[in-house]
Amino acid sequence: MVVAAPPPPQVPPHEITLQQLAALEQQKPWKNGKTDAFYADLSMILRTYLERRFQVPALESTTREIMPLLKKTDFPDQQSKILQEVLYQSDMAKFAQSPPSEQAHEKNLHNARKVVMASSGFVPTHPTYTNL
């Protein structure tokens, strides 16, 4: 009798998302004039995380629609305003051709990381994440 090996453990959504945010930060697409692409990627990464972690239809919802959906979950209230600001700035860069300043790009990445860690229960141990 052949016994099938157990499936590999699932990688938690916050780990995947933090890796994606780190890769996006390393690429710094805004430095190559790709601000729209940066904000499209940032928004997609966060929305995918919200779908996986909180089972809300974030990919097909507007920013305005996402926020009330998250209130019905265990998403931390204190992170709502930060998330909304990052998604709003992403929307403005993508749709209104109104990109934030270069300093805002790094801040939005920082805030995205902060939202993910606060909403996942993740306890930072890596020095990159300890000062959030």
Regions of interest found by a model, annotated:
Residues 29, 54, 62, 102-105, ...:
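Short linear functional motifs in flexible/disordered or boundary regions
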